[in-house]
Amino acid sequence: MFRTHTCGELRISDVNKQITLSGWVQRSRKMGGMTFIDLRDRYGITQLVFNEEINAELCDRANKLGREFVIQITGTVNERFSKNANIPTGDIEIIVSELNVLNTAMTPPFTIEDNTDGGDDIRMKYRYLDLRRNAVRSNLELRHKMTIEVRKYLDSLGFIEVETPVLIGSTPEGARDFVVPSRMNPGQFYALPQSPQTLKQLLMVSGFDRYFQIAKCFRDEDLRADRQPEFTQIDCEMSFVEQEDIISTFEGMAKHLFKTLRGVELTEPFQRMPWADAMKYYGSDKPDLRFGMKFVELMDIMKGHGFSVFDNAAYVGGICAEGAATYTRKQLDALTEFVKKPQIGAKGMVYARVEADGTVKSSVDKFYTQEVLQQMKEAFGAKPGDLILILSGDDVMKTRKQLCELRLEMGSQLGLRDKNKFVCLWVIDFPMFEWSEEEGRLMAMHHPFTHPKEEDIPLLDTDPAAVRADAYDMVVNGVEVGGGSIRIHDAQLQARMFEILGFTPEKAQAQFGFLMNAFKYGAPPHGGLAYGLDRWVSLFAGLDSIRDCIAFPKNNSGRDVMLDAPSEIDQTQLDELNLIVDIKENK
């Protein structure tokens, strides 16, 4: 038997017990004739004691143990004289009588500690060592608990977990597919699913009225902190439902997860916000509502006073940062440089302070009377000590997005984005379509299977850009954690949708004929939602990136530096797949 207990299990009630432990050497220290070793496994740390006076040979062997050696010990549980309140086993120690070295270890390239000295690249290369760290391991334990709670919740509501294929056909609409060549069918390719979207709709046609799957999904797209080329969805679909049914079901799931995993009781219904309001007041379809700073439009007040930057702008708007009038010129200049960064793209920033006597002092005083500045102050509801920050531009949507970045930056600087505070909302009434300059046509904002709002269906023939989708996203603290829609279940409406999106009947049949044909055999009204498991875990764990809640993630270039993937394959494999590699030079 390698162990009778784990390294996180023993307590003061176990004193005088004979036990056996196995684990890794975390650290060792020698004090006089005593050697102390912290033994670690995934359950915790237990202090081992070797006494030179009792057994000099055993103590000498203990002194030769290196970091991360794998050892087995047998000994007696003893009450610890100098207790450690920071760990659950801090009241006890083990007086070791037997030591067995199970394996030696090279010195790790970084310290296996919560606060490691390893950078991201080295940690990713030696991910199997990084996973020994409590800070990373606890994220995977949280992920495990979340999947258990998801399954329990959905099972209690009659959902059935069904696995769908990972090798499917390619559908070029949307993000790029990862493709897999077929050896058995030369010149033909599978695609890895971006989501099980069409397959779960087919399950609804099949009569599986409540489906879910914890599904691996793949998208060949540029990476960010909250994106990986492969990610995991809590994928769900329901038949005979309307939007309200789905929102109720999955708001319930969110509340269940908050209660069981974070101990947070969310009793109030989640706020609902139309997409148009989210963009108008926050410049984002995933607004962070942990703090205020709602946008105020100032075109009526600030235009027409001789300040050409505002006079020539299509949009003038700002935010009010409460109590921030103490910002220095240096801080304001830094904010100006922040919004002028290429990835944000503003031309500049105007600011105004509300003084203690209620007067307003701005960076454009020479163009505006105090009367106009007071009107501006009233529009914001600003008080003495507040700071008003204003952006303008000739593209309304672009300027709102720039103002969104400024709002988030101010929220961070003022300590308003507390990771232990959670504000949830549903964003609803999305546009059905968005114009693609690159494609020169309307594109589906979500996907082509989204049902339009019933009252907007007549607009499909007259003004498709004005059609709203029966779609909904759940947003928590400015992060989109899930989204879904009511689906089209009528073959004629689906064909009309493809037509608006520029599909010829032949192209629609070639790519989605299997779904349109299925609809002819009695498709029920249905809809669904997919939660991002990685995003939920990172949110609950307080992480800035989803990478640390994935066991073996890719880096920002989409590479697995531990496995050195992607990599070239040998010529024999290429020949079997009937492939020729022809890499074009960058011009």
Curated annotation (Swiss-Prot):
Pfam families: GAD, tRNA-synt_2, tRNA_anti-codon. Residues 197-200 are annotated as: Aspartate. It comes from the Bacteria. GO terms for molecular function: aspartate-tRNA ligase activity; ATP binding; nucleic acid binding. It is found in: Cytoplasm. Keywords: Aminoacyl-tRNA synthetase, ATP-binding, Cytoplasm, Ligase, Nucleotide-binding, Protein biosynthesis. Its main location: cytoplasm. GO terms for biological process: aspartyl-tRNA aminoacylation. L-aspartate binds at residues 173, 219, 446, 487. GO terms for cellular component: cytoplasm. ATP binds at residues 219-221, 228, 480, 532-535. Signal peptide: none annotated. Coiled coil: none annotated. Homodimer. Belongs to the class-II aminoacyl-tRNA synthetase family. Type 1 subfamily. Catalyzes the attachment of L-aspartate to tRNA(Asp) in a two-step reaction: L-aspartate is first activated by ATP to form Asp-AMP and then transferred to the acceptor end of tRNA(Asp). NCBIfam families: aspS_bact, PRK00476.1. This is Aspartate--tRNA ligase.
